[in-house]
A protein has these predicted regions:
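Short clusters of hydrophobic/aromatic residues that line enzyme substrate/ligand-binding pockets
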Residues: 9, 42, 67, 159-161, ...
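Electropositive phosphate-/nucleotide-binding environments in soluble metabolic enzymes
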Residues: 16-20, 24, 44, 68-72, ...
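PLP-dependent aspartate aminotransferase-fold enzymes
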Residues: 103-209
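Active-site-adjacent loop/helix segments that line or gate small-molecule/cofactor pockets in enzymes
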Residues: 1-46, 63, 202
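Hydrophobic alpha-helical segments, especially N-terminal targeting/anchoring helices
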Residues: 51-52
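Glycine-rich loop-to-alpha-helix module at the N-terminal edge of alpha/beta enzyme cores
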Residues: 3-11, 16, 58-141, 145
Length: 209
């Protein structure tokens, strides 16, 4: 049973022959801008384990599926939903699943105030874009403070907010009004700065911005 198996490499090389053939097809059909961190082609998964098309078994450390692959309760829920309908844009028609999930999120979100509302985005960058729009609409302020070292996404606005400039080469001009403060991380204090001075140092960087 894959769920309880240990990692195992059965091919002489990685990727194996079947995986290499699919990776070559990927390279021919999709842009290289969509990088790939590891030379495997997944065939199936159970729990935290995945098996590739050549039979190699890996422990998935990414953690996006934090309940694991093919979790039976989730599989049954997907099957049940697919039997009813599988797509309905929420700005065209209302469906209960969206409402139930929003209600659940609002019931547990640690946000002050009696009124809470939630909506769902397709990606982190889209969520960040909407968070900025909501903040600007509510405050009437034009500027944004972001931290050094931060990654926010690869849309035009979130690239501007992201500290790593490799993502933004050749993509300008960018929106104005984005200012960067030092992220409070004791391990990266300026050389020779004692820890007891670091808190005021990082707080003052926000005031300076």
């Amino acid at each position: 049973m894959l769920r309880t198996d240990l990692p195992e490499i059965v091919t002489e090389t990685l990727p194996g022959p079947k995986a290499q053939a699919l990776i070559d097809r990927r390279a021919a059909a999709t842009p290289s801008a969509i990088g790939c961190a590891y030379p495997l082609v997944i065939d199936r998964g159970e729990g935290a384990m995945i098996e590739d098309v050549d039979g190699n078994k890996f422990l998935d450390w990414v953690g996006v599926l934090n309940i694991g692959y093919t979790q039976p309760e989730v599989v049954e829920a997907v099957k049940e939903q697919a039997d009813k309908y599988f797509h309905c844009m929420f700005n065209i028609g209302t469906h209960e699943g969206y409402v139930k999930l929003a209600e659940k999120l609002c019931s547990i979100a640690p946000v002050k105030g009696e009124k809470k509302k939630a909506f769902f985005a397709n990606s982190g960058a889209e969520a960040d874009e909407n968070a900025v729009k909501i903040a600007k609409a509510f405050t009437g302020r034009e500027n944004i403070i972001v931290f050094s070292g931060a990654f926010h996404g690869r849309t035009l606005l979130t690239m501007s907010m992201t500290a790593k400039k490799a993502y933004a080469v050749g993509m300008g001009p960018f929106p104005y009004g984005i200012f960067r403060a030092k992220f409070p991380y004791y391990y990266r204090n300026p050389e020779g700065m004692p820890q007891e001075d670091a808190c005021s140092y990082y707080v003052s960087s926000i005031y300076d911005v």
